[in-house]
Amino acid sequence: MNYNEIGKTGMRVSNLSFGASSLGGVFHDIREAEGIKAVYTAVENGMNFIDVSPYYGHYKAETVLGKALKELPRDKYYLSTKVGRYGTDGANTWDYSGTRATESVYESLD
């Protein structure tokens, strides 16, 4: 696996990243255990950059990803997320304010 440093941060991320949208059932139904295994496999094979969003499966992707990451050493991965689009039950809410973005980060940590 090839890695590149992000600026001068010292963070070296893999050229390939794990896109966690499928963990939320965005494309098809997924068994939670299979999703967790996919995360383990990605990290075991050198992927250390994981992209997720609270909107993927209306928080489901974050929930499944969180279950997988609890079992992995914290220094094995970096997380990327998105802000601005929220919603449950098919309703969309758009809010790009700084206040809502900060709230979203803390919601994701729960």
Predicted regions and their residues:
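A short acidic, helix-capping loop that chelates divalent metal ions and anchors anionic groups
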Residues: 22-27, 86-92
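A short, structured active-site edge motif that brings together acidic residues
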Residues: 75-88
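N-terminal binding-site loop/beta-alpha segment at the start of enzyme catalytic domains
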Residues: 1-77
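Glycine/proline-rich, positively charged
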Residues: 92-110
